[in-house]
Amino acid sequence: MAKKIKDDADKNAETTKKEVLLEAKEEIHKLRNEFERESRERRNELQRVERRLMQKEESLDKKSETLEQKDDRLSRKLRDLETKEEEIKLLYNKEVQKLEELSGLTSQQARELLLSDVEKEVKYEAAMMVKDIETKAKDDADKKAREIITLAIQKCAADHVAETTVTVVQLPNDEMKGRIIGREGRNIRTLETLTGIDLIIDDTPEAVILSGFDPIRREVARIALEKLIADGRIHPARIEEMVEKAKKEVENILKEEGEQATFDTGVHGLHPELIRLLGRLKYRTSYGQNVLKHAIEVSHLAGLMATELGADPKLAKRAGLLHDIGKAVDHEVEGTHIEIGMELLRKYKETKDVIHAMSTHHGDFEPETIEAILVTAADAISAARPGARRETLESYIKRLEKLEDIANNYDGVEKSFAIQAGREIRIIVKPEVYNDDEIYMFAREITKKIEADLEYPGQIKVNVIRETRAIEYAK
């Protein structure tokens, strides 16, 4: 039994030994193949390097040969030039001698005569040179100015989105359209009357279009409508409540936008009311260009150019940011936006330098500081950039604003809204000023005024609304 176990163990040992030897041979064979492969690759690489070196050597030999040939040619040309120089000297001396004999002048006398003529010529050339230097200086100044402006524009890569006159509000389903319209249209009429915005409800799936030229009113209408949709309760009283909430929310947005603008431009220490007015510029457009984004861009451009020219970048940025501040209220106060802006800056204690730099950007006043010139230039650059402004939208908005101004100039008008793309104006009058009979005559008077003062296609509907409310509380 012990012998059998021993024999089995010997056999197993022999088998294991053979397996180990076989694995070792395979590993050796594998390593040998890998070594040969690496050796071949290295030999190939060395051959490639050797070929490249040989090619470079041949190239250098050719270049060396070419340089030697050029050197020989230059040496020959130099010798030829030296020979010709000697010949020219001989000819020159002979010609001088002949000229002295023919003219009866010595070389000294001829030299003095020549110097006199040369002096006149040099004076003329000097005058021309001064003129050329002046022209070159102007060209260099123009070039430097273009470089500074280009650098400022490249550093200030502001994005602009062309503003439109419509906003789309998404609905959860098309059934919501009926609830927004309300029984006999009372909900939609209430919302349009309170906001001054047209609600266009058509076949567009799950969407209502808000149309109006005043972006602030449109934003109030959007927020109010979205709140009503989310709340689910849509009736005139709830609409009034949501419109009031939306107005407060928009006021908060104005403040946040103004603060963000001062943060983005690095302009600090502004009066809170100026910050709020800056926020209002987010909802103002000039030829389709967002006025707040335009003001931020002007601030950046003016600051960058001031830095390049060694002027005061903080002053330039501050004046650039505030240069259109008058546009935040120019439809509420009489005067140009520059006059209004100057009055606002004086009211809120801005420095004379800031007011001056802001006041000159349309050429109403002569710029007296480099910062004022830079604000004017930055304003022109921002406005002139291709695609920044659209004339047709601006003229359309101005026509609607003029339509509202006609109504607002009458006493007893609480507010007015130009809607339906200017085809209708809704005028809400104070009930204590006009009675029910008088509003018909008032509507007729407004109609005649519009016909006299405005040019418009088609016809304009004048809708005068008089509303009386009696409120008591049961205790």
From Swiss-Prot:
Segments forming domain KH: 165-228
InterPro entries tied to this protein: HD/PDEase_dom, HD_domain, HDIG_dom, KH_dom, KH_dom_type_1, KH_dom_type_1_sf, Ribonuclease_Y, RNase_Y_N
Pfam families according to UniProt: HD, KH_1, RNase_Y_N
Cellular component annotations (GO), alphabetically ordered: plasma membrane
Record flagged with keyword RNA-binding: yes
Key word RNA-binding present: yes
Keywords: Endonuclease, Hydrolase, Nuclease, RNA-binding
Record region (Disordered): 34-73
Residue intervals of the HD domain: 291-384
GO biological process, one term: mRNA catabolic process
One MF annotation (Gene Ontology) recorded for this entry: RNA binding
EC number: 3.1.-.-
Reported function: Endoribonuclease that initiates mRNA decay.
Annotated HAMAP family: RNase_Y
PANTHER family referenced in this protein's UniProt entry, alphabetically: RIBONUCLEASE Y (PTHR12826:SF15)
Entry's family note: Belongs to the RNase Y family.
Name of the protein: Ribonuclease Y
